[in-house]
Swiss-Prot record:
Family: Belongs to the three-finger toxin family. Short-chain subfamily.
Expression (tissue specificity): Expressed by the venom gland.
Keywords of this entry: Disulfide bond, Secreted, Signal, Toxin
Protein name: Toxin 3FTx-Oxy5
Organism placement in taxonomy: Eukaryota, Metazoa, Chordata, Craniata, Vertebrata
GO cellular component: extracellular region
Amino acid sequence: MKTLLLTLVVMTIVCLDLGYTLTCYMNPSGTMVCKEHETMCYRLIVWTFQYHVLYLKGCSSSCPGGNNCACCSTDLCNN
């Protein structure tokens, strides 16, 4: 009986997602699953010398800040 109970507990732990992982958009396209310590998605707008706009997207452990950067903390929020 103890073996059966232990087996059920182990299977429950294995099948459950015990940690939440954030998903963000990344460059050039697609998505990425952030590392455990990366709790924010960011989108940074960079103006090139030819006045083209470049969007840098990804995961971060903190918001880089600045007027050209937007940060958020929910899945796929940095579109």
